[in-house]
Amino acid sequence: VEGLVKGLTGLTKSKKVTYFLGTGSLEANRTVNIAQADGTSTKIQGAKVILASGSVPRTIKGFPIGGSIMTSDEVLMLSTIPKRIAIIGGGAIGCEFASTFADLGSTVTIIEGAPKILPGLDPDVANVVVKTFAKKQITIRTGAVVAGQSKQPDGSTQITFTNGDPVVCDVVIMSIGRRPFADELGLKGTAVKVDDRGFVVVDNLCQTGEPNVYAIGDLINTP
């Protein structure tokens, strides 16, 4: 990851792209207010503005991110391989992490609320994955409704359910999808609209309700 960041930084310099480290929020007249990482702020204005703040992992109430509870973002920063991992969410990303950590030697449990993992896939395809996971000794718990979690004296985390026995693990990975990250876009004084699911509303050319302001990527609802 660090290598990719350095590579992209070098690429922006070679293309003479100016970048700011901070959080930008859109104001009226295509003005972006930037709260920079060093505590200062600055404003810039563009003839056209593109909103591309992406998405963030969804979380569950009662599972604060930090320490042994992490999302697909934090798990990439692990410096050691956990002995026991519980993955909440049996979708594509959750299954990818399950397979990877099982191959690395972790004891893995997938926790899925639906009747089967990979609920959006053809059952025949999902069954192939289930059989493969059985060979890797990955435990799959479907129809499991998570109730909460608690820290144990030995530092492990116990996950409880409304049905069934608890699961004890060293790391919990939340993998229940992502949501658009429009939280800090500002938008005061603009005609940019956000729908009830958090997506920025755009037309077929990705233009928002504000002229010459566009939104792209995970920030908009795509087929």
Whereabouts are the PLM-identified features?
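A conserved short coil-to-beta-strand element within the FAD-binding core of flavoproteins
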Residues: T18-V32, R58, T142-G155
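Core beta-strand elements of the Rossmann-like FAD/NAD(P) dinucleotide-binding domain
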Residues: D38-K48, T162-V171, G209
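Conserved N-terminal Rossmann-fold NAD(P)-binding element of oxidoreductases
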Residues: L51, I88-G89
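Glycine/serine-rich phosphate-binding loop and adjoining beta1-alpha1 elements at the start
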Residues: G10, L26-N29, N33-Q36, T40-S68
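Rossmann-like dinucleotide-binding cores of NAD(P)H-dependent redox enzymes
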Residues: V1-T9, L76-M77, P82-A86, A92-N163, ...
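Acidic/polar residues in short coil/turn loops that connect beta-strands
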Residues: A28, D38, D154, N163, ...
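FAD-site-proximal beta/loop scaffold in flavoenzymes
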Residues: G66-P82, P166-P223
